[in-house]
A protein has these predicted regions:
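Short beta-strand His + acidic residue motifs that chelate non-heme Fe in jelly-roll/DSBH
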Residues: 57, 83-84, 104-106, 111-116, ...
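Double-stranded beta-helix
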Residues: 112-153
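Glycine- and acidic-residue-biased ligand/ion/polar-headgroup-sensing regions
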Residues: 50-51, 69-84
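Short, surface-exposed beta-strand-loop junctions and turns on beta-sheet-rich folds
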Residues: 63-64, 89-91, 120, 128-130
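Conserved short histidine dyad/triad with adjacent acidic residue
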Residues: 29, 47-68
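A short, N-terminal "cap"/entry segment at the start of jelly-roll beta-barrel domains
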Residues: 1-47, 141, 149-153
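Short acidic-glycine-tyrosine-enriched beta hairpin
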Residues: 87-108
Length: 153
């Protein structure tokens, strides 16, 4: 299940928990648009600033934050990829296609990918990666995968 608003799509599980947020390359807004809720470990904001505007120099103060779990941000620089979304109990929810310029925040649940075209992709997440403790791999049922092969852009 998904909910879209102005080229921002929230992927929801069957209990309306947010599994992911996709910001399509065509998304636009005025000024600063904070897209994620305040309780997320990663904050995503869209900014539209005019030429010549000055953003005052600043530092980020060390603030203690407690994070449980891992949230990933993926930015697709080129190509296309299918993302399969799962609930935390590994129940398949839905799939979506991402293309060049799309950004996705994976907030909870599970996910898998199939590369549809050669991709260049950047991944951002809390680190460092805890090898052997950070993820549990599983084999989905291929017949469950449902998606439309429409170009996202």
């Amino acid at each position: 299940m998904s909910v879209a608003k102005a080229n921002v799509v929230w992927v929801l599980d069957y209990l309306n928990n947010q599994l992911a947020m996709i910001v399509r390359s065509s998304h636009q807004a005025s000024g600063i648009d904070f897209l994620t809720p305040d309780n997320y470990g990663q904050q995503v904001a869209y900014m539209n600033r005019p030429k010549g505007e000055v953003i005052q120099a600043h530092i980020h103060e060390p603030i203690s934050r407690t994070l449980i779990g891992t949230q990933e941000v993926l930015y697709i620089r080129k190509g296309r990829i299918r993302v399969d979304f799962y609930e935390s109990d590994r129940t398949y929810v839905s799939s979506m296609i991402l293309g060049a310029g799309d950004l996705m925040l994976l907030s909870t649940g599970g996910h898998g990918f199939e590369v549809l075209e050669d991709i260049d992709m950047i991944e951002i997440k809390q680190g460092p990666f805890a090898e052997g403790r950070d993820k549990t791999r599983f084999l989905p049922e291929p017949h469950e995968i449902r998606y439309s092969d429409e170009s996202p852009n």
